[in-house]
From Swiss-Prot:
The gene is rpl5. Part of the 50S ribosomal subunit; contacts the 5S rRNA and probably tRNA. Forms a bridge to the 30S subunit in the 70S ribosome. One of its GO terms (biological process) is translation. GO terms for cellular component: ribonucleoprotein complex; ribosome. It comes from Aeropyrum pernix (strain ATCC 700893 / DSM 11879 / JCM 9820 / NBRC 100138 / K1). This is Large ribosomal subunit protein uL5. It comes from the Archaea.
Length: 192
């Protein structure tokens, strides 16, 4: 067992069980399906446009504007007003961005950031922490949320059957432990 695997909050026996299972049947090995990056400003206007420029520069993909679901008078937000920008990355772009984003957080993620389906979310407090990004005074400092969606091969098949509502069995869902092992293997992530 590698030194990386010893830094996980999982018993080493369980880690080796998971790795053996993935070796025996490669279709059980989870994979990163997509990475969603979100910058929420809370207001429309010039600041949101600059956030969109920053997100496009970071990801190499054009962001989508997200609208407010309801009016919140205390914050001066109207229903339907653009308040955030987001990008969904897949494939090689997702992995490349994820490497840089994990560098920004020091390859450390809280265990509580993993949901019951094995997906992971974490925040980056300042976008200038991402390697290769320089501070621009006209933009300021922006925080962002990064969500990693992890699934096993075959998960998409059940989701695309619109006529016959599919059910994904519990045994086919990705567990927290598997997510920890996968991210530790791919990126050297430590869970605290």
């Amino acid at each position: 067992m590698s030194a990386k695997a010893q830094s996980l909050p999982i018993p080493p026996e369980r880690v080796s069980e998971i790795l053996d299972e993935w070796k025996r049947s490669p279709m059980r090995r989870p994979r990163i399906v997509k990475v969603t990056v979100n910058i929420s400003i809370g207001q429309s206007g010039e600041r949101l446009q600059r956030a969109a420029e920053v997100l496009e520069e970071l990801t190499g993909q054009k962001p989508v504007f997200r609208k407010a679901k309801r009016t919140i008078r205390a914050f001066g937000v109207r229903k339907g007003e653009n308040i955030a920008v987001m990008v969904t990355l897949r494939g090689e772009k997702a992995l490349n961005f994820l490497k840089r984003a994990l560098d920004a957080v020091g390859h450390r993620i809280k265990t509580s950031s993993i949901d019951e389906h094995g997906n992971v979310s974490f925040g980056i407090e300042e976008h200038i922490l991402i390697p290769g990004v320089k501070y621009d005074p006209r933009v300021g400092i922006l925080g962002m949320d990064v969500a990693i969606t992890i699934q096993r091969p075959g998960h998409r098949i059940v989701e695309r059957r619109r006529q016959r509502r599919g059910h994904i069995p519990r045994r086919h869902r990705v567990t927290r432990e598997e997510t920890m092992v996968l991210l530790n293997q791919l990126f050297g992530v430590t869970f605290v």
